[in-house]
């Protein structure tokens, strides 16, 4: 059974893991590098025992690492104490009626003032101490809109209040995910992908057993991570060149990407595919529930998985 990430993040592969994971090479004895790990869904659910989670989003990566090193029961208790401290709703104990709400309208009205106080306290401590309180951060994710992890350009967490709370389903999702994460020999790195790959190539520990999975920002999408110029053509070219170097060194890789999005195409990726002997698999995915894709009758996204090994 797939362990779903207990918070939402742009570009999650949770919805296609049933297609993606069977395309991975045999994982016994391999080290998986999840080069753009995001919320960790791929690394957590892959069969590899040793997983390197790498991502430049330090809040996201730091939360994963904190969950890995903290006993599940202690983390759960700390979150529940935080909820009680700020007076946030506990529908799993008291039900919706206790808060004058129902499951349709949700709990946003009841939680808004307490949520904003928690958000202000988190941002203030982050600014003053230069560190993150991951219990407060995860509590914000629970009560935030769509459980989204979002920061503004000034580094402040700015997700608005949502309509749900730490219900039984959310608690189960958290515990299941943490148990699966803890079953791995997990390592964490917050490096630019170029630096990460250089370090991996120089490591004797990983020699001969490395598999690199890449789910980079997609050059032609309008996802949040590209709205501020977070991924450009040079990044795309550098990543594809790095994958060629992995192939030349006999290292297996897998790349998730998008060749077409609405009326746009990715000529850099298409030319690379055309001029290389790599295998290309079409991935079927619906974006109907995504918060960052336009919903029009002409919308089309062509997602692919590209590998340098025989499937």
Placement of each model-derived feature along the sequence:
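Mobile active-site "lid"/loop adjacent to the S-adenosyl-L-methionine
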Residues: 153-165, 218-238
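Long, positively charged, glycine-interspersed low-complexity recognition regions
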Residues: 219, 228-311
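S-adenosyl-L-methionine
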Residues: 1-36, 41-42, 46
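Short amphipathic alpha-helix with an adjacent loop that forms part of the alpha/beta core around
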Residues: 197-207
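A structural motif corresponding to the C-terminal end of an alpha-helix
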Residues: 173-187, 241-254
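Class I S-adenosyl-L-methionine-dependent methyltransferase module
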Residues: 49-184
């Amino acid at each position: 059974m797939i362990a779903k990430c207990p918070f939402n993040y742009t570009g999650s592969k949770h919805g296609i893991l049933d297609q993606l994971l069977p395309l991975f090479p045999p994982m016994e004895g391999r080290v998986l590098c999840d080069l753009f790990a995001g919320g960790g869904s791929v690394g957590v659910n892959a069969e590899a025992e040793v997983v390197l989670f790498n991502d430049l989003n330090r809040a996201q990566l730091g939360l994963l690492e904190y969950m890995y090193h903290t006993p599940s029961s202690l983390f759960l208790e700390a979150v529940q104490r935080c909820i009680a401290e700020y007076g946030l709703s506990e529908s799993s104990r008291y039900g919706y009626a206790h808060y004058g709400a129902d499951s349709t309208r949700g709990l946003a009205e009841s939680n808004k003032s307490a949520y904003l106080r928690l958000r202000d306290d988190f941002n203030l401590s982050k600014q003053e101490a230069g560190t993150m309180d991951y219990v407060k951060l995860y509590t914000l994710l629970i009560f935030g809109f769509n459980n989204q992890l979002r920061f503004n350009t000034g580094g402040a967490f700015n997700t608005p209040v949502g309509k749900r709370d730490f219900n039984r389903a959310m608690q189960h999702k958290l515990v299941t995910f943490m148990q699966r994460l803890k079953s791995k020999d997990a390592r964490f790195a917050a490096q630019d992908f170029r630096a990460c790959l250089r370090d991996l190539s120089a490591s004797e520990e990983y020699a001969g057993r490395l598999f690199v999975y890449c789910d980079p920002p997609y050059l032609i999408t309008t996802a949040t991570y590209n709205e501020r110029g977070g991924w450009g053509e040079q990044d795309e070219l550098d990543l594809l060149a790095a994958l060629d170097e992995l192939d030349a060194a006999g290292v297996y890789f897998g790349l998730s990407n998008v060749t077409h999005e609405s009326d746009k195409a990715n000529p850099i990726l298409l030319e690379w595919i055309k001029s290389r002997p790599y295998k290309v698999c079409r991935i079927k995915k619906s974006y109907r529930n995504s918060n960052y894709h336009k919903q029009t009758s002409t919308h089309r996204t062509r997602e692919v998985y590209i590998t340098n090994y025989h499937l």
